[in-house]
Swiss-Prot record:
Reaction equations catalysed: ATP + H2O = ADP + phosphate + H(+)
EC category: hydrolase
Keywords: Acetylation, ATP-binding, Cytoplasm, Cytoskeleton, Hydrolase, Methylation, Muscle protein, Nucleotide-binding, Oxidation
Post-translational modification: Oxidation of Met-46 and Met-49 by MICALs (mical1, mical2 or mical3) to form methionine sulfoxide promotes actin filament depolymerization. Mical1 and mical2 produce the (R)-S-oxide form. The (R)-S-oxide form is reverted by msrb1 and msrb2, which promote actin repolymerization.
Family indicated by similarity: Belongs to the actin family.
Organism name: Xenopus tropicalis (Western clawed frog)
Main location: cytoplasm
Propeptide residues, chain positions: 1-2
Complex formation: Polymerization of globular actin (G-actin) leads to a structural filament (F-actin) in the form of a two-stranded helix. Each actin can bind to 4 others.
Gene3D superfamilies linked: 3.30.420.40, Actin, Chain A, domain 4
One matching Pfam family: Actin
Lineage: Eukaryota, Metazoa, Chordata, Craniata, Vertebrata
Name under which the protein is recorded: Actin, alpha sarcomeric/skeletal
Role summary: Actins are highly conserved proteins that are involved in various types of cell motility.
Amino acid sequence: MCDDDETTALVCDNGSGLVKAGFAGDDAPRAVFPSIVGRPRHQGVMVGMGQKDSYVGDEAQSKRGILTLKYPIEHGIITNWDDMEKIWHHTFYNELRVAPEEHPTLLTEAPLNPKANREKMTQIMFETFNVPAMYVAIQAVLSLYASGRTTGIVLDSGDGVTHNVPIYEGYALPHAIQRLDLAGRDLTDYLMKILTERGYSFVTTAEREIVRDIKEKLAYVALDFENEMATAATSSSLEKSYELPDGQVITIGNERFRCPETLFQPSFIGMESAGIHETTYNSIMKCDIDIRKDLYANNVLSGGTTMYPGIADRMQKEITALAPSTMKIKIIAPPERKYSVWIGGSILASLSTFQQMWISKQEYDEAGPSIVHRKCF
């Protein structure tokens, strides 16, 4: 344990789907749990059962049958502050078991996070949790640090939102950031829909979690979608079976790659957007012509929705088709990319040069929440 060191910084990456939290300097987060707050659907009937009025994270997940589940972070942006406070409280006191007033805390935010949101995060940290110091960093920038680079373009795709963020010498270029409201949760919903067409019914929030598991275990990205569809139609080589919690076994075939294909063809779910290969290209084209070469050669994948087998090869193929023919294109898919935002935060918060970057409680008291715009960019 490193918390005997009084001042170890905490790193908390709040995603739409999962909270990743732990101590700076560690190589992986200590706590990873769903960003969910659940409230009982019915009045408790058992006397003395000690019914709580709300449950957070894994406990909410395990009692999902009797709860209504809410996600306080939608599309990467915090929308429900009361529930978010519950999640932070749970993170500090139940998961990490630390007193937040003793540790500087690094939080992450979505690219293009509204200014009012950064201020609100800052305010809650200092006023509710009394942290001695805090900092807010952009998720994609941290992922790039984790890959050992300061220049590149990050495709960060999690549960609620996908971003393309070009970064030059450590600074995100806001004018070229592309946001796509299509990510893991939408792919899970789409898989629920196409499994229903196969005759398997998944409807409740509890059943959605089962489908998410099917997606994580069996889905992959096809290098050539049409070819793969033809193969799936003529042979059973692509079929896999999955055992449901009640013991029933279901078989899935072309759904395995039709589900993540949505990332490249959002029209599958009725979205009029460009696919992730095109948004990457568009983002690069919005950057200065002199840095494009560096971006093409440093395409870093980050987040859980980039974990599909085959996604890097497919990106390589698609971007090569869009880019100038002589351009060197490299897709970097680090094996730990599911947690690379957190890892980047852990690296950043433990750098000696970073120590003067923290916003201290004193600075906050003097300047108020708007200090965050001056210190964190």
